[in-house]
Amino acid sequence: MTQNEKMKTLIEYLESYKLYRAMKELRDKDDAEPLSEAEGARKKMREIRSFVTSMPDSREKLFLYYHYIGGRSMERCAEMLGVAERSIYRIRLRALKLALCCFPGERAAV
């Protein structure tokens, strides 16, 4: 797997948190979803949250948490981190590179 493919897989993994959160909210809203799927979504959310929080403390870790776990926009992340909006894109790239170093291969199958 190339570095670009690994990066894409990592981004899909982190962004899947939003999908699982939506599934959980749907389940909480009405019982349209089977309980086992909701439990699976909660488990996946805990796994992703644990992955992000296990990273070394840094501005990049905060960005990953705010953006992917918290669902905040890039602009809001910049504001929360006290940086210019144009800087948040560099922080995002550094954060993803840092996360890629911690991203185990077995998680590649999102």
Q: Where on the chain are the PLM-derived regions?
A:
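DNA-recognition helix of helix-turn-helix
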Residues: 82-104
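Secondary-structure boundary/capping signal
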Residues: 59-63, 85, 107
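Helix-turn-helix DNA-binding module
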Residues: 70-86
